[in-house]
Regions:
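Short His-centered aromatic/hydrophobic patch
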Residues: 88-93, 112
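Nucleotide-sugar donor phosphate/pyrophosphate-binding loop at the beta->alpha transition
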Residues: 67-70, 107-109, 117-137
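Nucleotide-activated donor-binding/catalytic signature segment of Leloir-type glycosyltransferases, i.e.
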Residues: 266-288, 296
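Acidic donor-binding loop of glycosyltransferase active sites
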Residues: 292-307, 323
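Conserved donor-binding/catalytic core segment of Leloir-type glycosyltransferases
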Residues: 4, 145, 185-201, 205-209, ...
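Conserved acidic donor-binding segment of nucleotide-sugar-dependent glycosyltransferases
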Residues: 339-351, 359-365
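Carbohydrate-associated surface elements
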Residues: 150, 171
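N-terminal subdomain of nucleotide-sugar transferases
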Residues: 1-47, 246
Length: 401
């Protein structure tokens, strides 16, 4: 089966989700069609056709012009290749895939990932463009796939046809995201979480400029690591995490490590407390090293500008490594968290987050190991790439008949 994998732009890292299924389904003949790609991971050995490489130029006028010119070229390239199925990731920038499917009569599968499913998100030209692409994808897709039940409900509210919409959890490779080979070192005993009154605002007790930019693993194995992996943005809640961690650091010593980049990176580097370490973007192997080193991974994604977290694959990656997670109860996040083993925080405030992190750091080594094993087992059984691939294979076979 020839499958055209289409996406507006392809950046790997970090967007491994766009190619994970293709790499796990070698029985299909894959070709990626995109406006522009930047793939620095040599393991992503897929043929890629770029319709407008200059789209990644930082100059906005050049980027916009080449994007417009590249849409038709991308559509024609997909049609000329003659695929059996076209699979578009994200409704935004789906016009070439929709057009190619229409003119060639090929079935179109569209995976919705987040903001592309919302009926009204922002204003201006960007919002109008998103709406145009979303309508085209909803009308032209043979099957619409949402990465969580939450996002499927968002899509239904935006006008998606329920008869063509289903949930397809992306899954993570549990043969790659695995616990550390060596046993986790024992730690000093920490008391149970303290009970203390909540302040009006959690203070950040640090002078500006203390955030350390360092990607190396810590030598002090006894100091527990609280880890964040993702975009350093308000949507991902990294500001809440730093505030919560700072309030806890004196009474519950730990190191907060932030892996990634984003709009809040500069501010965090300038003002983060001394126990916070920023690594910047890292290769996937280095991310896994940090995940395995962590005692708990925290993803406090919160509603921002009308949208919420659709899934949160980093939660699955961490739990596949046997590391429990702490997350805000928002959007599709609860669907990615092992029931009874990881922690969901209903109150989305730095104070509530601090209490949840405190609870996680108080777990004994035995309890941590038990929770980690439960996390690993749940992800392997319910959210593995293996299961996701099996479902996708069935979908392809159904639409290609």
């Amino acid at each position: 089966m020839k499958v055209a994998l289409t996406k507006g732009t392809l950046l790997v890292p970090p967007t491994y989700f766009a190619v994970a299924h293709a790499l796990a389904m070698p029985e299909c003949d894959w070709r990626v069609f995109t406006l522009a790609a930047r793939v620095s991971d040599s393991s992503v050995a897929l043929p890629i056709h770029e319709a407008a490489p200059g789209v990644l130029s930082p100059a906005l006028p050049v980027r916009a012009l080449r994007q417009a010119r590249g849409l038709g070229a991308m559509r024609r390239a997909v049609s000329s290749w003659g695929p059996d199925v076209i699979h578009q990731h994200q409704a935004t920038w789906s016009l070439p895939a929709v057009g190619a499917a229409r003119e060639s009569g090929v079935p179109l599968v569209v995976t919705l990932h987040g903001g592309d499913a919302y009926p009204r998100l922002g204003r201006g030209l960007g919002a109008a463009w998103n709406a145009r692409n979303r309508r085209a994808a909803f009308e032209g897709a043979t099957r619409l796939l949402a990465v969580s039940r939450y996002l499927a409900d968002v899509a239904l509210g935006a006008g998606a046809d329920p008869a063509r919409l289903s949930v397809h959890y992306q899954g993570v490779d549990t043969d790659w995201w695995t616990p550390a080979p060596a046993h986790r070192p024992a730690r000093a005993h920490y008391p149970a979480p303290a009970h203390y009154p909540a302040p009006a605002r959690v203070p950040v007790p640090a002078e500006p400029g203390h955030g350390l930019v360092d990607a190396s693993l810590p030598a002090d194995a006894d100091t527990p690591v609280v880890l964040f992996v993702g975009t350093l943005s308000a949507l991902k809640g990294v500001d809440d995490l730093v505030e919560a961690s700072a309030a806890l650091a004196t009474r519950r010593p730990h190191r907060l490590v932030l892996v990634g980049d984003g709009p809040l990176a500069s501010a965090l580097r300038a003002s983060a407390p001394a126990h916070v370490r920023l690594t910047g973007p890292l290769p996937r192997e280095r991310v896994r090293e940090w995940v395995r080193r962590a005692r708990v991974i925290v993803l406090p994604t919160k509603p921002t500008q009308g949208r919420q977290e659709a899934a949160g694959l980093v939660l699955l990656e961490a739990q596949a490594c046997g590391v429990p997670v702490v997350a805000y109860r928002t959007g599709g996040t609860p669907e990615m968290v092992t029931p009874g083993a990881s922690l969901l925080t209903a109150e989305r405030t730095p104070w509530a987050l601090s209490r949840s992190i405190d609870e996680a750091l108080a777990w004994s080594d035995a309890e941590l190991a038990e929770r980690g094993a439960a996390c690993r087992a749940w992800v392997d059984a319910e959210r593995s790439l293996r299961a996701s691939v099996a479902q996708l294979r069935t979908i392809y076979e159904a639409v290609a008949r």
